[in-house]
């Protein structure tokens, strides 16, 4: 995970997280990165739910999952062909 590009959303609100995640994914696609990490923290899960909703609705995302060793982080895999 340390080598993956990451977006840290600590301290962000749900509405700003949505915009930041969309911009981050666009950047990763432009850079031809196929895997990245979104750090949302554990807390009450509000930001995590927003992140997962954005990822679920983005057709360019192959899969996403909570990191096994760090539940405050979601690993995102981007489709090869977009």
What are these regions (language model features)?
Residues 1-82:
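Long, charged, low-complexity intrinsically disordered regions
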């Amino acid at each position: 995970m340390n080598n993956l590009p990451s977006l840290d959303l600590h301290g962000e609100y749900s509405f700003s997280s949505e915009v930041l995640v969309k911009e981050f994914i666009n950047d990763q696609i432009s850079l031809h990165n196929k895997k990245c990490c979104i750090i949302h923290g554990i807390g009450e899960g509000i930001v995590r739910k927003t992140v997962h909703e954005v990822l679920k609705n983005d057709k360019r995302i192959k899969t996403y999952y909570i990191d096994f060793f760090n539940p405050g982080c979601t690993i995102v895999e981007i489709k090869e062909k977009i």
